[in-house]
Amino acid sequence: MHADEDFSPAAERVGMSSPLSHCQYAPSVAAMTAVRRMVFVPFSAEQMYELVNDVVAYPNFLPWCAGSEILSQDAARMRARLRLKKGPLDASFTTDNRLETGRRIILSLVDGPFSRLHGQWQFEPADGGSMVRLELEFEFSGKLLGKVFTAAFKPIADSLVEAFRARAYVIYGR
């Protein structure tokens, strides 16, 4: 499966359940933009987890990332800030990331131009490599600004899985 394909029921058969589907808070889906991507890579789940969790390296390979910093971190959590710059979008946001080493990173919005942002990365071992899955739901604050920012941010979100797949080949070879 390629990074630009949406999930199908087959994606669920690989055993990658989503904790987002069990959230008690159910935001209005009509206003939310959702991104769901999955790709197989010939690298371990642990290697892919390390790439995604290396927030400080993002400006080195994500062209829209104008800056990143880790505000706090321990074994189970990381608070990080990213600065995005693409077209009319020039904004910083902070997330609290719950870390399940080698398996999952769950993102929750702390502050930024979003009214809502939550999601997760999942890394599942598979024969000859791993499956990398991203689920992201977001909504920008303000109706007019929200439309402009969504138009700029959705392509960024859509390209994330492919960007990390490409980065894995640069870092790990093959």
Q: Where are the model-predicted features located?
A:
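A conserved amphipathic terminal alpha-helix motif
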Residues: 140-174
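Hydrophobic-ligand binding "helix-grip"
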Residues: 59-60, 67-75, 83-131, 137-139, ...
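Hydrophobic pocket/interface hotspot
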Residues: 48-49, 58, 80, 132-134, ...
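Hydrophobic ligand-binding cavity/cleft-lining segments
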Residues: 16-75, 128, 174
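Short linear segments in intrinsically disordered or otherwise low-structure-confidence regions
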Residues: 5-6, 21
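Short hydrophobic alpha-helical segments enriched in small aliphatic residues
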Residues: 3-5, 26
